[in-house]
Structures are given as structure tokens and as C-alpha cells.
């Protein structure tokens, strides 16, 4: 093929169809950059290359027979040599055409790839940034941030209200049980509740009992809870030190109040940082990864509380609830009882109920004999098949929803896997069992066994449905922890399901392996600890005075173990600035909003290379200026010269001039302020300038603009999600109010059966001497002088149900009064607290209750 030489730079455009097919679909940002012509690559100059190619081909004698454009001949028909096999070198020409077409595509792909890489890295010039800004709508991002913050505050407030209602329901339930146990009158309980509400309202109006925080206290608590939120090592250590009876309330304070119930990148990053440290500490105290399953450790409790937040609840409601409802709850005749003995006993009972005669079946058969009976087998076999069928649906739903599993749960499992592999050199199956335990048993299983408690179903479950769910949960638990049922205890009846379990284990192993394939939180959430300095609004938490007091006391009690070795530990400094913890009781407990403030912000600023307080302001100003000035053009030859880059100061000076020329004083003012801010940041060492170029700063601006659309979309979704969350919370609040009404109705029904027979009978004050109370063990200690014991008497009366007024008299002179609450006594007795300390006297709780029961309660 003499005369045919293909130069390396030649590119061919075959015809109009080929041209359109070879054009790559570059993303919008890349297209905008290409159209502007401001790029550091010369790959995009395709038109000139194509002209060069056609000239080259004609010079080499390839003009004949290669008509690129179609044209009509003298007869009006379209003539093209493209498909004319009789033309010279037809096959060779087709090969060459294909090669050149491939080269066009390759060049376009390289061009797109390089521009995408430049976009991801933010390596754009000012003109390209302006081109991107022109494609974006100018909006006020801050307004959305403020709205989202307000929605979050409202949501947290609603969550707190719901929790208070739930506590009221639980307290009411407990009081009913205790009062019935002590033969209390239900009518008095209702009267006491009404009086308690009035008393509480009255006490709330009493300024002497209203707890207020002075400005210094408020600021210290703002600093304290910011420190706890952003420095996770304190809480990670504290959760291992507190008592078991304090754990649940404290974890609620941490996960619900301090980090919020809903998902947001900042709070999620912080809470996962807490998990990172807590998991590391927990696993440093055990000998193998499997010990996490065998011991009642802190991390499983943390995970349970964490998974009950909004994101975990939504997953369970969307994935698990439909399977539950369709296959178990709405199947009233479904019975998955696989215990052969129980099945046999049910057979006998049903036979006797149907016939009205005692069954002839032998009630004394051994288990091995029962399981061999054909009648029993005929019942068990279809139940096993049905159980497998339902388990298969749950299994499929769980496996196929991996990508919808909350990121935080997956990352926590990844941490466990990583530390287990590093610390213990654990085998893959051992780690898989641990991951399966946390994902299934500590998350999904709880919702399957008690869906009503997790609020993923509104229907009440029958006893049979609950038993069915327990059996289903057992099968899935063994499957996800890679175990089979053994021939012992209650497990022997589940052994027929082992074959199905074994058939799925390879899929489970792959699922658990895929589950931990997630990126680090800083990459996934696009958050790191330095983002704190760029927050446009300070974080806000809604917290009760009781929670503040509890946390304060726990920190003081464990400060020695919590503080760092440095002389000036931040936590210790804040605690020293605070007075003693608040004395909070139910009557004066209330919620406040804490705007969290970083007292030690300057310490973080020293660690980073950008002064974020000026950075956030300056970025917004630069974007505003770039929108208002003409697009900055670059000479083509400058794009290849690394020494010649954008002179940001010159651009800003031109902006000042442009503002004056166009009568836009705001533009000039903004540009001047940017120049001043740049000089300040440079003086602080936050940014560097080479010949007024500020290349690093321009890159920061580019990344801000490139990601702005995505950020806005995330905010839009978050706003919508928070609105829906608020609606659901208010629905649940309505449900709780209905539940309280149900309790009230129940109390009224009980009243019909347990009301006093003699409504006119009244309780007169009871007189009892000091010596008699001491003899009966009611009085344990007293500050009353011994000489006065003989002449001291107590008069006990009850004008209000559950409230006992005690007046002390020496002779006929009254020397003081006090009140005893039946609720307080019953609570202390239930909690095992032996003594009640009052002013000048200490009472034995149980002996006091006995006295009141004997002389008052039976007559109420």
C-alpha cells in the first residue's frame, strides 16, 4: 500500500452520522469547560485536526473514492463511494476508516476523562469556574441551612415530648401496680393525679423552685456538651465506667439528645467516631472476637440504642414490616409450632374438645415415641415447609436490601472486622459470626420478634403469631451466625431446618463480606473534624435539666479516669468553672436549648492550614463577585505555560473597576473585602500566594462550585426527610396520648369493682407516741432530744389521697410538720432503699408502709 501514510496526529471525520456518533457525552460541567475553551489540554481542538486530516489524505492521493459528504449526481440520485465495493482499495479503505473512527472516540474519551479528573480535583481556572457558575441558579444556601436547623430543633423537641409521654405511661403503669399491691383505692389514685398536676403547676409558678442558669453556667454547659460531642474519647471511656442501672438513661442522653435521633452527616460522623473508640476499647479487653457474643458488653447496648434511631427504624419498616404483615400477622391460621410433644398434646386437647370424651391417646409417651407417630409427622412436615417458605422470604428481603442497610451499621461491622483481624488474627467464619450477630440479632431480630415494640406495625399480635415469629427468628439467627440446630433441648425440634440453613450459608458468607465493603466516614459523609470551623450556624441540642445534672455528676465522679495526662485537660477546665451539679426533681425539671460553643476553638485552628472563619466568608464573596464580572479569558498559549496562571488580585482589582464603571458599589466593596481577607489569611499563614495567584484558594473555590449542586440536592432531600419525620413523630405523639386515655379508662373500670363501700367514712388523725414509733421500728434515727421523747407525739392525717401530713407535738405545742408521699415510699421500697431521710428524722421505709397500710389504706 505504497503512498498511504497515517500520521500520528491524523483524525478522521467520516460523515455526518459518524461525526454525531463519535461525539462523547461529556457531563455538563465538562461540556461547559470545553465550550469556554479555557482548558490546560489541547485535545479538544478536533475541528482543526480534522481539517488537517482531510488535507493530508488528499495530498496522499486518497481523495478519490472517499467522499465524506454525500452529493447528488446528474440523475438526482445520491452517490457515495462509501459502500461501493468496486471502488479501488475498498476493503483497505474500510479498515482505515474504522481505525480513524476509533481514534476519534479515543481522543474524546481521553478528553472527557482528563476533564473529569480536573473537576474532581478542582484544578480549574477562574474562567472555567465562572462558566460553571453561569449554569447554576443563584440561590441563598444559608436560608436552607437555617430552615433545616429549625426543623431539626422542632424534631428533637417532638422526640423529647414523646419520651416524656412514654415516661408518664410507664410511671402510671408502675404506680397502678404498686398501689394495687398495697390495696390502695383507685379512686384516690385518680384524685392524687389531678392534685399532683395542680401542685406541679403551682410549684412551676413558684419562682423559688424554678431552676435558672446564670450566664456563666449556661456558657460552661454550652462548652461542656460541645466538648463531649466533638471529642469522643470522653464518652467512649465513660460508657464503660457507669453502673448498669444508669446505662439505659445515659445512652438515651448520648444517642438521642446529644447526637439527635435523625441522620445528618456531621452528627453521624461524630457518633461513628465515638463507636470507633468504644469498639477499640471493648475489644482490647477480650481474648477473641467471639467473646463479644458471649459477654454482656457495652458495645452491643450502644448498637441497640443506635439502631433505634430514625434511619434504622425506616429500614425495618420498609424491608421487614411488609414481610411480617403479609406472611405472619395476616395469617391467623398459621401455626409453626415444631415441638412434637406440644403438637401431640394439642392433638389430645382438640380431640377431647371436639368429642366431649377423654382421648384414648397415651399421654405418657416419650419424646422419641411421639416424634415417630404418623399423625404427628403429618402435622410437622407441612409446618416445616411453611416455616422454610417464610424464612426464605425474610432471607431474600434481607439479602437484596444490602444497599439500603444504614451506612453506620455497616461501618461499625467493618470496624469490628478490622480490629478482630488485627488483634486476634481471627478466621473469616469467626468474624462473619460476629458481624451476623450484630447485624441480625442486635438489629433485625428484635424487630421480627417484637415488631409492635419497635413501632413498625400498628396491629396487635396474637399469641400464636408471636410464637411463630420466635421460631422464624431462631432459624434466621442460626443462619446469619453460621450455626445449625443441635440435637439437644428445644433445638432438636428445629433440626429439620438445618438442610435449608446449610444451603444458604455460602450466600450469607458473601453477604457479610459485601456488607463491610464501605468507605471511611470522612469520605462517605464528606465530613471531618475540621468542618467544625466552617459551620455557618452553631449546633443546637434540646436537653433537660435532669440530663444535664446526671451527665455532670457522672463526669465529676469519673473525672480521674476520663481526663488526659496533660496538665490542662479541657474537660477538667470546664468542670472547674461550673458550680455543683443542679438539684433537679420531676417538679422542676424542664427542657432548655443549648447552643453548643467550642471554648477551645483556637487549639483546632492551629492544626489546620486554612483560617476557616475567614474562609467561609471569603468563599461566598468570591462566588458572588465571579457571578457579577465578565468571564475571564485566557490566551491559548498561556494554558501550556505553568508559570502563567490566574492573577487573582488583578482579577479582583478589575472587579473593583468594573463595579465603578457599572455603578455597582456592592461589587466593588465585596472585591475590596476579599483582597483584605486574603491578606489577613496570608499573614496568619493560612494560605500562600505566589505572585498574587492564590492557586490553592482558587482550587477551594472550584471544589465549592463543582459540588454546590449536589450539596443543594442533599439539603433539599434532608429538608423533605425532616418534614416527614416531624409528621411521623406527631402521629406517634397522638398514639401515646390515646394510650394515656386508655389507662385512664382502665382505671375507671377498675374503680367500679374496687371502690370503697362507705363513701361517707372519713379518716381521722391518728395519734402515736415517739416511743411507740421507735419500738415498732418506724423511727430509726432522730435529732429530737432524748428528754423530750416521752412527751413527744405524732398526729398523722391524710386529707389528700396518697399524701400523709405528720404533725409533731411536745405536749400540746406544735413543733413542726412534714408530709410523706405514698409514691415516694412505694418507689423506695420497690428499689430496695431501706431508709427515708427527712428533716430531723430517719424513717424505715417498709415499717412506715406497714403502719400506713394498717391504719389508713384499708379504710380509704
Swiss-Prot record:
Record GO biological process: chemotaxis to cAMP; detection of mechanical stimulus; hyperosmotic response; mitotic actomyosin contractile ring assembly actin filament organization; mitotic cytokinesis; negative regulation of actin filament polymerization; protein localization to cleavage furrow; regulation of actin cytoskeleton organization
PROSITE patterns (alphabetical): RAS_GTPASE_ACTIV_2
Keyword Zinc: no
Keywords in alphabetical order: Cell cycle, Cell division, Coiled coil
Extent of Low complexity compositional bias: 21-46
Coiled coil region boundaries: 146-185, 663-732
Variant or mutagenesis effect after changing residue 474 to E: Unable to complement a gapA null mutant
Induction: Rapidly up-regulated by hyperosmotic stress, which is dependent on dstC. Strongly inducible by 8-bromo-cGMP and to a lesser extent by 8-bromo-cAMP. Not induced by DIF (differentiation-inducing factor- a chlorinated hexaphenone).
Key word Iron present: no
Bias (Acidic residues): 1-20
Start and end residues of each stretch annotated as Disordered: 1-48
Chain ranges of the Ras-GAP domain: 269-515
GO CC aspect terms: cell cortex; cell trailing edge; cleavage furrow; cytosol; filopodium; lamellipodium
One GO MF term attached to the UniProt entry: actin filament binding
Disrupted-gene phenotype: Cells initiate cleavage furrow formation but rarely complete cytokinesis. They grow as giant and multinucleate cells both on a substratum and in suspension culture with increased cell mass but development remains unaffected. Mutants lacking both rgaA and gapA are extremely large, flat and multinucleate, and exhibit cytokinesis defects similar to that seen with simultaneous loss of ctxA and ctxB.
Impact after mutating residue 442 to K: Able to complement a gapA null mutant
Biological function: Part of signaling pathway that is required for completion of cytokinesis. gapA and rgaA control cortexillin localization to the cleavage furrow and hence may be involved in cleavage of the midbody in the final stage of cytokinesis by regulating the actin cytoskeleton. Forms a complex by linking activated rac1A to ctxA in the absence of rgaA. Assembly of this complex is necessary for the recruitment of cortexillin to the midzone of the dividing cell.
Oligomeric form and interacting partners: Heterotetramer. Quaternary complex with activated rac1A, ctxA and ctxB in the absence of rgaA.
Protein's name according to its UniProt entry: Ras GTPase-activating-like protein gapA
Name of the gene encoding the protein in the UniProt record: gapA
